[in-house]
Curated annotation (Swiss-Prot):
It comes from Arabidopsis thaliana (Mouse-ear cress). Residues 1-21 have a biased composition (Polar residues). Residues 205-300 bind DNA. GO terms for cellular component: nucleus. The gene is ARF42. It is found in: Nucleus. This is B3 domain-containing protein At4g02870. Keywords: DNA-binding, Nucleus, Transcription, Transcription regulation. It comes from the Eukaryota. GO terms for molecular function: DNA binding. Residues 1-39 are annotated as: Disordered. InterPro entries: B3_DNA-bd, B3_domain, DNA-bd_pseudobarrel_sf.
Amino acid sequence: MTLSDDPISPSTQESSNSSYVRSKEAEKNSPSQETDEEVLKGYESYRENPSNYDNDNILIYTDTFNLYDDMFEGSLDSTRNFGAQKDPNVLVMQRLLHNSGSLIGVDMEQDGIDLATLFADSTEDSKLPYVIYEGLEMQGEGYGTNTRGPFENKIDIGSFGKSGSVMNVEREKEKIVMIPTPRFGNATPQWTIKKKLSSYDIRPRCGRLILQSSSFNEHIGRHLPKDQMIKINVGVNVNVYDYDTGTLHELRLEYQRQYGLAHGWQEDFVRRRHLKQKDEIGLLWDFSSSRLQFGVISRNTGPGLWETKD
């Protein structure tokens, strides 16, 4: 059916309004008698003069909108009326802009109603703006936007789909609790032997770190292999790891009236670490590597010997 030709009802004047309405209903339900040739002529007329058929606004007559049903269904007749409805409400829908098959924006308004004022005065139902926002949904190209009433909506939700999902994302953001990444500091070794250096320990002529027999037997001697303990009188080589500097040194563990570390103690530790009298050091036996670990626990801030000459 073309946009300019409307089927003419019977020319006989109806005697009453009821008979006129029945004839119009019968006319609407009857199939179109237009031929293919007439339809093609209508298309050609539109193609040659499209401005005759275009307007800035489209008048749509429809009943009260349903929140979950499509708002606009059917087709416009020759007068551009959206079917025959009871008690129609006239809405003005401006043209829809499309981007890759999704609606970009829809403006709907009714005379005398201002959305901002309506929401500001909605003291009876505080959830009204939220319900309307939840009712909006995108159904793709060719569909309208559902709403509960004739409000002016200017919402751009792009191609996100249902606007309810956008609100769900916002709610999830509020639930996120930032947990700081735990930082594990370097655990200080549990020194099993602690000693404050004496003047004898730092003298170059002695060149030995003296260890008490009880401390040596409990924390070092019982962990050494038997073949090394047999040679302890003449001395056995052991690795000593400096925990503070991360360096590995080889010293000689020996027994000469007292247990002690020699052959490298003066050069690799006293001089290199600038040790002085009353500095506190720590030692422990590392089972995993079969070696000693060394560390400086505290420094003597007062006067004390660093190096003496005989």
